[in-house]
Amino acid sequence: MFRLTLLLAYVACVYGGGAPYGADRGKCRGNDYEKDGLCCTSCPPGSYASRLCGPGSDTVCSPCKNETFTASTNHAPACVSCRGRCTGHLSESQSCDKTRDRVCDCSAGNYCLLKGQEGCRICAPKTKCPAGYGVSGHTRTGDVLCTKCPRYTYSDAVSSTETCTSSFNYISVEFNLYPVNDTSCTTTAGPNEVVKTSEFSVTLNHTDCDPVFHTEYYGTSGSEGAGGFFTGMDRYQNTTKMCTLNIEIRCVEGDAVRTIPRTSDGVGVLSHSETITVIGGCLSDVNVDIEYSDSNHPEEVDDFVEYHWGTRLRLFPSPKRCRLVS
């Protein structure tokens, strides 16, 4: 027990290190402090002066206890209490130890209402932009600014981070053909969409298109035929993918292959591509009109592309649903 007491006393003296010396015109060296005309050793960070110096004895320093600290050299009579635990919308960004205070910052999804000397004292949840709006910036305090998504953009998430991205949620594919005779047709829905008559078939193959095709029609007037494929409006296109449509118009007779040229390029801001192919020689005139649009902005002009070969056709017969083939 006697040896332990001596050891503790030695450790305390080591913190102080050295004996007081006289101040030079009231000034001490380095970080030493002046007391009663004597210069004494300051305690290092992480400790405090459990006993100040006196004639013949230097400062006695003791380590800070848990949840207390001193960040610099000092001769304070006690360590400073660390800030309380980070709770609520706060999360700990710096832990409390003997040389530094605890620092709290806002947890994810929150912004700072009241800053402290370090970190934040009070945080609040960031505003969440509703569907159809995106994050456009931040206030001076860090809250979210929401702006209605402009033309050809959308955000379908309720979020404090999502921005408006170029997208569409509706695709319509309409075709006009000449000459045709058969007024009856069948369709097949699934991975590919097909309209079929006794003279030809129109097959729509689609890759990486999120809007789902589920409606089709076909009708005739005289020797002209018209049909179409349409998606629902409940799914937006993922803008990291390219929606690709490959439309094959195949005559029952003939095997000559023609690629129909694009005659209208649209606005060119949405992620899509198309290929229109005619196989066989039963048709002299082909028009394919494809529209990509956002149903939440019906007042805006759609992204419209046109493919044409032969005479331009503008037939719009009364839609006729085809008989479904499973």
UniProtKB/Swiss-Prot annotation:
Pfam families: CrmD_SECRET (PF07190), TNFR_c6 (PF00020). One of its GO terms (molecular function) is tumor necrosis factor receptor activity. Residues 1-16 form the signal peptide. Keywords: Disulfide bond, Glycoprotein, Receptor, Repeat, Signal, Virulence. PROSITE patterns: TNFR_NGFR_1, TNFR_NGFR_2. GO terms for biological process: positive regulation of membrane protein ectodomain proteolysis; regulation of T cell proliferation; symbiont-mediated perturbation of host defense response. TNFR-Cys repeats lie at residues 27-62, 63-104, 105-147, 148-186. It comes from the Viruses. Disulfide bonds join 28-39, 40-53, 43-61, 64-79, 82-96, 86-104, 106-120, 123-146, 129-149, 164-185. Glycans are attached at residues 66, 181, 205, 238. Binds to TNF-alpha and beta. Probably prevents TNF to reach cellular target and thereby deampening the potential antiviral effects of the cytokine. This is Tumor necrosis factor soluble receptor.
